[in-house]
Amino acid sequence: MIELKHKNEGFSSVYKILTNQKIYKIYNHIAFSKYFRVRLIKFKKLYDELYKLKLSVNHKVIANRIIEIEEIESDQELNIKKLFNSEKLLKNFLNQINKISFINQKVSSKKIIHEIENYTKDNSQHQKINKKINELKKYLNIYHQNKICHGDLHLGNIIINKNRFFFLDWDYFVLSSYGYDLAMFAYLEKLSKKQIEKISLYSKVSLEEIYHYLPICQLLDYLYLSLTYKKNNEVVKKLKLKVDKFISSNL
């Protein structure tokens, strides 16, 4: 057994078994207590849908904290420059993201607001956010919250094989809108204004919707990192200032 990597600051680890070429993702107990991840047994319906729609490789929940994952490797290098320099590749990528919305929404009832509440309730550090939960809910509900979203799209979670995109690591899937997944990709990959305009054009999702969710991506990033790092961490402090400004200006 070869350990490939730790995920999410140590709440899971990924291993490869050489004898059967399978990947195993093993979760620690803090994944469900500290980081509020969904119990694996509830992932089965999602994984079935993903495999049926050819959005991801085959996953099997084989124990309370263990997932067996079919091994697949990219057969071509993928980076942001290459993605945006090829209209065909970018459209293919965006079409595959759009297919995520075809997943039966009954696989989950968890929305972004529930994710925010998990991090802020009973946490004195986030009382300012918690007091604005109702306003945040209204802000989110400007767009329908009825599509399954990956919730953590970045190049590290994307594989391209035989010109098909596969999305991995669905730990943060939620009900939201197509624009949220595009915003999260733009946020995590630090896309330029021109690149965001391009994904809006090809995806036919308005710039307004994508930009609407960018501060929500920043808020979630802050809440997650504040669990991982101390309050005086420079990244956390900078994010907090931006989150405070968003709350004061928009809620």
Regions found by a protein language model. Name each.
Residues G179-S206, P215-E234, K238-F246:
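Active-site activation/catalytic loop segments of kinase-like enzymes and analogous catalytic loops
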Residues G10-F11, I23-I62, I67, L78-Q96:
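A conserved alpha-helical element in kinase catalytic cores
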Residues K16-I17, I26, E68-E71, I159-I160:
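Conserved hydrophobic "DFG−1" position in protein kinase catalytic cores
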Residues H29, I66-L83, E117-N118, L219-N232:
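A glycine-centered beta->alpha junction motif in the catalytic cores
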